[in-house]
Each structure stands twice: as C-alpha cells, then as structure tokens.
C-alpha cells in the first residue's frame, strides 16, 4: 500500500525508482505511475525476480521461434501450502485496537490508507490479506504466474476478459483464501 505514494514522491524529486510488487493498489495508480515517469523523465523498474530465471528466457524463446503460438486460454495456479491469512472468511469485523509498538511509527506505516487503529493483524506478513493494505494471493503470486503470458503473448496489453469462477473464503475485509479466474 505504500509503494505507490513513495514511488510518486521519488519521481517528483527526479529520482529513478525500483519498486517491488505490489506496485500499486489499482490500475489507476499504475497508470498514474507511468504518466509520472514520463512527466518527470525518470527511469523506473518493477522488481520481479522471475525475470532472472532460465524458464523466463526459455518461454520467450519458445514464443519467438513459434514453439508456443496460437494460445487461446491460459490456466495458472499456485498450490504452495503458504497460508494467506488465518480468517478463512470468518472475519465479522476489523480487529480491535492494540498498543502500538514503540519501534513502529503507525501513521507513517499507514501511508495514504484511511486511518485504522493499530493491530498486529495488519503488520508483518498479514498485511497482504487485507483489502486496504495488500493484494491477496493473486497480487503476490499473479505477477510471477502470468508474467510470461503478459510479457510475451499479450506483449504488454491487458486481456480482453477476466471472469471470476470461484472465491473461497471471501470476506468484505480480506481477500479470498483462494480464487479461480478465467
């Protein structure tokens, strides 16, 4: 949630930026970042360590040589046992306030997000699960799972259609435990 405002501020200062995912919280923020890079004439890079792997370059070669062509459907999944959050759709309200640790500047951590009372459920790896702070499993892993498709098959364009087929553990506060998109 803080990558966008920090990157915007740095570009306004004329600084080149390297930003790890999640880059932004919305397509609008991504568009604003691209426009700011052009406006301020700075170099930008989104970090994705997958671009350093052999399989990334191998897939690129497969597309360029025609081994992979005429793709009409992509199915990507992540079945790693890592938990995304502990609530599994049972969360009825936001967590109650806790004492802010002396080592944390909570207002700075919130960045541009609307005020929330501090809870340890928002920090460390848990921030990824909350709509206000993270981007869920798809935001964390989608960049890795569909990066080659986006880069080499769609050539940087967006897909024509994305359908939600399943959202397990959906809640108005946190992202689903898993989802199926087509």
Regions found by a protein language model. Give the residues of each.
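A structural signal for well-ordered alpha-helical segments within the folded catalytic domains
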Residues: 4, 8, 31, 53-57, ...
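Short, solvent-exposed loop/turn and secondary-structure capping segments
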Residues: 4-9, 29-30, 56-57, 84-90, ...
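A generic secondary-structure signal for well-formed alpha-helical elements
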Residues: 15, 34-37, 41, 63-71, ...
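Structural recognition of the beta-strand scaffold that forms the well-ordered cores
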Residues: 18-19, 25, 43-46, 72-76, ...
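Rossmann-like NAD(P)H-binding beta-loop-alpha module
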Residues: 55-109
